[in-house]
Curated annotation (Swiss-Prot):
Family matches, as Gene3D superfamilies: 3.30.1130.10
GO cellular component term of the entry, any: cytoplasm
Family assignment from sequence similarity: Belongs to the GTP cyclohydrolase I family. QueF type 1 subfamily.
Alphabetically ordered keywords of this record: Cytoplasm, NADP, Oxidoreductase, Queuosine biosynthesis
Main location: cytoplasm
Protein name, entry field: NADPH-dependent 7-cyano-7-deazaguanine reductase
Source organism of this protein record: Trichormus variabilis (strain ATCC 29413 / PCC 7937) (Anabaena variabilis)
Record: residues binding substrate: 75-77, 94-95
Length: 136
């Protein structure tokens, strides 16, 4: 038997964590395309997308695939990651999330072409894949 007193468990701090602050402040940031005039594809995979079902409140998980042909601007990847993380506590349907991501992406970098594919993890024996496209 030990004479030491039991450890106290500290309560979580109510202050906003730096990661939460970065996500809340996050915006899609772009920089100049280093090869304007050359047509090339950029493929991005974001395997940890989460949001909440607007009907049940249950979490939904997806892999987001973004493919785009840049024009004059390219999206900065850390900013994109933080933007995607901002959906974590948002109540939004599969269809609306894919469309909103595409709308915001196009507004930020005005690509020649862009496709957002949201491949949701099956829930209740239903597998949903939403693919939306933009072309100038």
């Amino acid at each position: 038997m030990s004479n030491s007193s039991p450890e106290t468990v500290s309560q979580p701090s109510q202050e906003v964590k730096y990661g939460e602050r970065e996500i809340a402040e996050g915006q899609l940031i772009t920089f100049p395309n280093p090869r304007v005039g050359r047509r090339y594809d950029i493929n991005i995979t974001l395997p940890e997308f989460t949001c909440k079902c607007p009907f049940s409140g249950y979490p939904d998980f997806a892999t987001i695939y973004i493919t785009y042909v840049p024009d004059e601007r390219v999206v900065e990847l850390k900013a994109l990651k933080l933007y995607i993380n901002s959906y974590r506590d948002r109540y939004i349907s599969h269809e609306e999330s894919a469309n909103q991501i595409l709308d915001d992406f196009v507004a930020a970098c005005d690509p020649l072409e862009a496709t957002v594919k949201a491949d949701f993890t099956p829930r209740g024996n239903v597998h949903t894949v939403v693919e939306v496209k933009h072309r100038k």
